[in-house]
Amino acid sequence: MKPLLLLAMAGLLACNDSGTDSGMDSGISQRRIFVTDTIQNGNFGGTAGADELCASQAAAARLQGEFKAWLSTISSPVSGRLTQSSVPYVLVDGTLIANDWNDLVDGSIFAPINLDANQQVRSGDVWTGTLPDGLPYMNDDCEGFTSDSAGIALCGTTASMNANWTANATPPCSTELRLYCIEQ
């Protein structure tokens, strides 16, 4: 009976304060964030297409690891798609953005997310579909980011360190914007 109790206690110790498994960060001291160097309208194939774009730009810049877009649809929030990390989120040059996931979704960040995968400064708005708490904007999402003609979607801005980094405006889906990409 005692060995089972020890195993149960060890399992409890493997969880961080938020109740998520801290093993997801094993061997990783930080997760990198960049903004795409290209712009696209609201039709980029949904979250899968956005993730593909992030992976492609990371690979072209020789960044190791898996990168996904900071992009929510009404049915698929970033809080369910992305790793909720307990390590810091940083720009590709090492600039601190947030101490961990909870800090990332608290309504403010430490620096603007304005560097692309090659450390070039980029400006402008960014498709997110994501509120500051990591939940999806429920009013519209360019039909799951598969349409450039129907509706609007939430965007953030690369210039902001407050909640506007992810929730700044709701432009038409025909607008060409960037994406944020986060290492998983």
Predicted regions and their residues:
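Sec-dependent signal peptide recognition
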Residues: 1-8
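C-terminal motif of bacterial Sec signal peptides marking the signal peptidase cleavage site
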Residues: 11-14
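Secreted/extracellular ectodomain signature
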Residues: 16-184
